[in-house]
Curated annotation (Swiss-Prot):
Pfam families: ABC_tran, TOBE_2. Belongs to the ABC transporter superfamily. sn-glycerol-3-phosphate importer (TC 3.A.1.1.3) family. Signal peptide: none annotated. PROSITE patterns: ABC_TRANSPORTER_1, ABC_TRANSPORTER_2, UGPC. It catalyses: sn-glycerol 3-phosphate(out) + ATP + H2O = sn-glycerol 3-phosphate(in) + ADP + phosphate + H(+). GO terms for cellular component: ATP-binding cassette (ABC) transporter complex, substrate-binding subunit-containing. The gene is ugpC. It is an enzyme of class 7 (translocase). This is sn-glycerol-3-phosphate import ATP-binding protein UgpC. It comes from Cupriavidus necator (strain ATCC 17699 / DSM 428 / KCTC 22496 / NCIMB 10442 / H16 / Stanier 337) (Ralstonia eutropha). It is a peripheral membrane protein. The complex is composed of two ATP-binding proteins (UgpC), two transmembrane proteins (UgpA and UgpE) and a solute-binding protein (UgpB). Keywords: ATP-binding, Cell inner membrane, Cell membrane, Membrane, Nucleotide-binding, Sugar transport, Translocase, Transport.
Length: 366
């Protein structure tokens, strides 16, 4: 195991197209880090630079105490698990897991010990004589992970390993990955576009957008205090509501705010008590998680939501509607009697209000 350091890491392609912009991160020995972001944000490129499959055009990558920029992948003491398994179809499960050790010249007894140990961890022991075509998708992915485990690397790299699995298998494999990391304690860097995977697996997560770091933190920190409107809209399902607001006429900094209605709409919403010490500009974006917009009695309401659609999902329901013409989502108790066409009185607590600068999208702190 080893710590992993990314220091001003950059990637520029021919024609001065920069796709990774000066990324810095210190990853502790044994930490599980998830890089999450939309397609094309640079997350797989960053992972491939750590692996040695892409050249680095700026900065340094340290694995342990070594700068690995110019080392071949085989010299970096890493093991990588890919999205598409990359198994040899003519080889058995045992031989797929053992192949990398064989070409390194390891003794047969040591290979057998490592393969059998990994197979026991991953519940693959009964399948060691099978070919990949005889396995389910989840079993194939476990073989790919077993092939990485037998190398006993300093760092595991995962490139969207669950993307090819169906929804039920993804949940199962998430749990298995979490348990595997708990048992092995190996430093891990995991790439995904799926924010649920990021939230459930990560010790800390890095949110990437267009090759730049938007935020680094624990899943709870990122969810509870998003650093930008991008993070607020990307992390969470449904995402955070973002509503334009303005200071009431005549109010000074920190005064009441009102929702800015779309033309021809009446917002009828004034935010009463803003968080202490919060200084807001004339215009801002208000962020509210769907679970923090609470249905209430009419006399307690700060706004009314015009409900268009209600989705019943069992334990929860979601009401999709508008507030002054601005789209909002409200999470409801499954027993709430709300229907399309209702005007739903709602309120919220000051500690659940988030504010962002409309020009930069950055969080406004108290």
């Amino acid at each position: 195991m080893a710590k992993l350091s990314l220091r001003n890491v950059q990637k520029t392609y021919a024609g001065s197209v920069q796709v990774v912009h000066g990324i810095d991160m210190e990853i502790a020995d044994g930490e599980f880090i998830v890089i999450v972001g939309p397609s094309g944000c640079g997350k797989s490129t960053l992972l491939r630079m750590v692996a040695g499959l892409e050249t680095i055009t700026g900065g340094e990558i340290h694995i342990g105490d070594k700068v690995v920029n110019n080392l071949e992948p085989a010299e970096r003491d890493i093991a990588m698990v890919f999205q598409n398994y990359a198994l040899y179809p003519h080889m058995s499960v045992y031989d797929n897991m053992a192949y990398g050790l064989k070409i390194r010249g390891m003794a047969k007894a040591e290979i057998a010990q490592r393969v059998n140990h990994a197979a026991g961890i991953l519940e693959l022991a009964p399948l060691l004589d099978r070919k990949p075509r005889q396995l389910s998708g989840g079993q194939r992915q476990r073989v790919a992970m077993g092939r990485a485990i037998v190398r006993e690397p300093a760092v595991f790299l995962f490139d969207e390993p669950l993307s090819n699995l169906d929804a039920k298998l993804r949940v199962q494999m998430r749990l298995e990955l979490k348990e595997l990391h708990r048992r092995l304690g190996t430093t891990s860097l995991y790439v995904t576009h799926d924010q649920v995977e990021a939230m459930t697996l990560a010790d800390r997560m890095m949110v990437l957008n267009a090759g730049r770091v938007e935020q680094i933190g624990t899943p709870l920190e990122v969810y509870s205090r998003p650093a930008s409107t991008f993070v607020a809209g990307f992390i969470g399902s449904p995402p955070m509501n973002l509503i334009p607001v303005a200071r009431n006429a005549g109010g000074d900094t920190g005064a009441q705010m009102r929702v800015v209605a779309k033309e021809g709409e009446a917002a009828n919403a004034t935010l009463g008590h803003l968080p202490m010490g919060l200084h807001l500009p004339e215009q801002a974006l208000l962020g509210l998680r769907p679970e923090h917009i609470e249905p209430c009695a009419a006399h307690e309401a700060i706004a009314e939501v015009d409900v268009r659609v209600v989705e019943a999902l069992g334990a929860d329901s979601f009401a999709y509607g508008s507030l002054g013409g601005q789209a909002v989502v409200v999470r409801l108790d499954s027993h709430a009697h709300v229907r399309a066409g209702d005007r739903l009185p709602v309120t919220s607590s000051a500690e659940h209000l988030h504010f962002f600068a409309p020009d930069t999208g950055k969080r406004i702190e108290a």
